[in-house]
């Protein structure tokens, strides 16, 4: 099954557009995990199990694992998700961008080692830096477009010769040329709802959006759904990380994470209907 088909199935089966971001910070873990050598895996595994009923996908951020030499724990986590929650796609957030031969190895890392269903990439080096990921025809390639950070405007809002901003040029390039196999998506932040709406208008319904910026970054759920949903009321993975992961650091942290995920899913669905 292709990434897009798997995602469409998850949207329908879970009735959710919520993507749970997995950005583990051991300094914020509950006390019961202190000193455990596989604490990152245990924390993320239990978050996954608590939130899976309310999610359409999971997004582990590779730097949070690599910084703690926990790549093996990330690998184990991806194996757990695929085994216990096989209907939910894994989007590996790595934002890779390099020349073809290096990209080939990044693709193998994401799609062979971690068995991710999709990967975030940077478009800055052009098509030949993205083609090694597109060669994996059943996997998703999620391209940075209009990111949620304020500094994104330094480049992404620059005007092209035809007057359109760079982020819209990227959106059009991906939708019209790079997405020939129907495997591309775009990263567009919830913190810029006007730009989110412009991207959706430019790309139509077929290209899914990964939308960070809800919760701690200040993105508004109502504005996000209204701007970014496709004509079927879907088409988005609305990511939340910290608001779910650290809903509680007490003994109820698993339950609190599940309740936070359910609340976000329901808040998103209230706008869809």
From Swiss-Prot:
Keyword Lyase carried by entry: yes
Cited Pfam families: OMPdecase
Active site annotation, chain numbering: 95
Gene3D superfamilies, per database record: Aldolase class I
This protein's pathway: Pyrimidine metabolism; UMP biosynthesis via de novo pathway; UMP from orotate: step 2/2
SMART domains: OMPdecase
Catalytic activity: orotidine 5'-phosphate + H(+) = UMP + CO2
Entry keywords, A to Z: Decarboxylase, Lyase, Pyrimidine biosynthesis
EC nos: 4.1.1.23
GO annotation, biological process: 'de novo' pyrimidine nucleobase biosynthetic process; 'de novo' UMP biosynthetic process
GO molecular function, one term: orotidine-5'-phosphate decarboxylase activity
Alphabetized HAMAP family for the sequence: OMPdecase_type2
Family the UniProt entry places it in: Belongs to the OMP decarboxylase family. Type 2 subfamily.
Name of the protein in question: Orotidine 5'-phosphate decarboxylase
Organism: Bordetella pertussis (strain Tohama I / ATCC BAA-589 / NCTC 13251)
Name of the coding gene: pyrF
């Amino acid at each position: 099954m292709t990434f897009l088909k798997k995602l469409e199935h998850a949207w329908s089966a879970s009735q959710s557009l919520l993507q749970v971001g997995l950005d583990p910070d051991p300094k914020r873990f509950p006390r019961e995990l202190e000193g455990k050598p596989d604490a990152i895996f245990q924390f993320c595994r239990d978050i996954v199990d608590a939130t899976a009923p309310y999610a359409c996908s999971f997004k582990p951020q590779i730097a949070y694992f690599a910084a703690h030499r926990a790549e093996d724990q990330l690998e184990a986590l991806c194996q757990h998700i695929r085994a216990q929650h096989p209907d939910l796609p894994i989007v590996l957030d790595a934002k890779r961008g390099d020349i073809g031969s290096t990209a080939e190895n990044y693709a193998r890392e994401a799609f062979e080692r971690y068995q991710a269903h999709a990967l975030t990439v940077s478009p800055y080096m052009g098509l030949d830096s993205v083609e090694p990921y597109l060669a994996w025809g059943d996997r998703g390639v999620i391209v940075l477009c209009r990111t949620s950070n304020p500094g994104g405007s330094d480049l992404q809002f620059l005007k092209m010769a035809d007057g359109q901003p760079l982020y819209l040029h990227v959106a059009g390039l991906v939708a019209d040329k790079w997405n020939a196999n129907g495997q591309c998506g775009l990263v567009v932040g919830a913190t810029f709802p006007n730009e989110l709406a412009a991207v959706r208008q430019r790309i139509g319904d077929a290209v899914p959006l990964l939308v960070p910026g809800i919760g701690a970054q200040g993105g508004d759920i109502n504005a996000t759904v209204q701007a970014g949903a496709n004509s079927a009321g879907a088409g988005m993975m609305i990511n939340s990380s910290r608001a779910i992961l650290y809903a509680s650091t007490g003994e109820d942290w698993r339950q609190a994470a599940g309740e936070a995920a359910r609340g976000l899913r329901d808040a998103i669905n209230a706008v869809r209907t």
